[in-house]
Amino acid sequence: MASFKGFSVNTVPVSKAKRDISSLAATPGIRSQPFTPSVDMSQSREFLTKAIEQGSMSIPYQHVNVPKVDRKVVSLVVRPFSSGAFSISGVISPAHAYLLDCLPQLEQAMAFVASPESFQASDVAKRFAIKPGMSLQDAITAFINFVSAMLKMTVTRQNFDVIVAEIERLASTSVSVRTEEAKVADEELMLFGLDHRGPQQLDISNAKGIMKAADIQATHDVHLAPGVGNIDPEIYNEGRFMFMQHKPLAADQSYFTLETADYFKIYPTYDEHDSRMADQKQSGLILCTKDEVLAEQTIFKLDAPDDKTVHLLDRDDDHVVARFTKVFIEDVAPGHHAAQRSGQRSVLDDLYANTQVVSITSAALKWVVKHGVSDGIVNRKNVKVCVGFDPLYTLSTHNGVSLCALLMDEKLSVLNSACRMTLRSLMKTGRDADAHRAFQRVLSQGYASLMCYYHPSRKLAYGEVLFLERSSDMVDGIKLQLDASRQCHECPVLQQKVVELEKQIIMQKSIQSDPTPMALQPLLSQLRELSSEVTRLQMELSRTQSLNAQLEADAKSAQACSLDMYLRHHTCINGHTKEDELLDAVRVAPDVRKEIMEKRGEVRRGWCERISKEAAAKCQTVIDDLTQMNGKQAREITELRESAENYEKQIAELVGTITQNQMTYQQELQALVAKNVELDTMNQRQAKSLRITPSLLSATPIDSVDGAADLIDFSVPTDEL
């Protein structure tokens, strides 16, 4: 299985709708069966969408086998107006699960759809008529197609009651004679072999056939394929045809904007600003055969990085102008054909679910036709099919366009019976050789001169400028016959006669085919009136119930809504966890609570910043003053420290001086004491010699003088010798 690279995700597998089991069990005509929850692919879709928006070049794709869901079997009774009632049963798909809530209205609407004679004998009403033997899902599909074709509306739960009323109104205003437009549409189907009843040929050998052919040629309001939603079928099919030819801008851009945008993100496009081919990042999908040569179908260089990837390279600088994922039709078409018959999902369904624009080669188209597996390959409402992958190749050769258009009209089983010769003509192998020779003539004109054909505005007429000599793709003998019929001058008179005769025949047939006895006609009229009255009352009851439920829901949510409004506009900075619990207690929705708490957090941060700024502004002056004072004090402290150091030096000098003086003083004092002691000794001697009393002599104090004790005692006689 190849990996996709950048497919746009616009159409994804429909998620299974959840249903209330208890309400379904109480619905009449439903047998209860076990319910299995469905697989939700929303996460995969979100992943792919984000990756594509970010320009991712490698998005892994995984095939998911969605398990079958056991749904309830529903039985409905359809009561046509002109025949007996019959029942249909089956399961309702998840996409139409809302119909389970309005089964009575569905039965009434199916009664009208099962009675095509109520709508002017319209061919559209006959084509989508509900018939006995249908399954419930087929009947619902027929009903949806009927509403889309007749009312140009899409069936939804919201407008279902309006659709039923419109069907009733349309049926009540009908007449028994069908309009000329419906006749012409029916006859055109027979003329071109597209009628489901088998191949028929319009006889134009007489005047009546010529008149019918002229009417068919003059009519332009015939739609063979219904549109999607409210898109007009002609606009829808014209858009598909333009995409098939690589002319997306020729389609109505009010309906095909997304597909056109994806187209120019995938296929080679000329960038007028850079004057070169754009470097495409998004990858496309090619359905091709294993034996065909893709390089012969493009003017660019073809590079294959691996078996599943193809790059188209610019011939000037080899940059990538387009990227494609190659899928072989032999690998997916047979499995898709078998899955369609078994009601399962195929690999091709998963491929188509991840892209809006797909390329398929002419060889792949011929392969699916040859092997009888072409149904559902190109006729997909969610995918726009482009024949070929190089726009210039398709526009210049038209190879495969007619075959693809034919496969879009009908299933292969119908084409094999009604358009066998056309298929044989389109399947001829000589067409590929002719296309190859025509494309070689394109390449001979030079690469640079062909760049203008890839301009997004598509200003030039593509192949019309390149191939004025190219012959027509087919020869239509019917067109010649219709042109010849214009020369008939009696056509208006014959046409009027034919119309009158047909009206008479239809009136006679309607009288002869009426199986109802005349005695039962009044009762049948009363029954129809009562049925219409019952339908009207049921619709009024449904509207009343819906209105009542809406009023109750509004009353219950009024208080909560008012509280939500108050909380959203209330300014608060309380972001505590307990506050979230209180909001949950008053039943505020989780998303609203989250929004409120985030808003409060932002307000709180804003106020914190504001308060911080104001406080900082007020404190800045004080801080500056304190800083200045601190600097002044620091200078004073420095000066005091210097003064203290000077004082300490002076003190040390003074201490040294004092110490020196003390030492000098002590020495001098000792010398004086010693002298006095010597004098005392001499006085003692003289006193003795003079016989003076010794007590009258004063002695020198020796104890008060340090070092006096060590002095020589002169009182002791010394030996002078």
UniProtKB/Swiss-Prot annotation:
Subcellular location: Host cytoplasm
Coiled coil ranges: 523-560, 628-686
Segments for region (Involved in the formation of factory-like inclusions): 471-721
Site (Important for the formation of viral factories): H570, C572
Signal peptide (residue range): none
Description of post-translational modifications: The N-terminus is blocked.
Gene Ontology MF terms: RNA binding
Keywords, alphabetical: Coiled coil, Host cytoplasm, RNA-binding
Outcome of swapping H576Q: No effect on subcellular localization
Keyword RNA-binding in record: yes
GO cellular component, one term: cytoplasmic viral factory
Domain of life: Viruses
Chain intervals for the UniProt region annotation (RNA-binding): 1-38
Domains (record comment): The C-terminus is involved in the formation of factory-like inclusions.
Family the entry assigns: Belongs to the orthoreovirus mu-NS protein family.
Subunit structure: Interacts with mu-2. Interacts with sigma-NS; in viral factories. Interacts with the inner capsid proteins lambda-1 and sigma-2, and outer capsid protein lambda-2; in viral factories.
Protein name: Protein mu-NS
Organism encoding this protein: Reovirus type 1 (strain Lang) (T1L)
Gene name of this polypeptide: M3
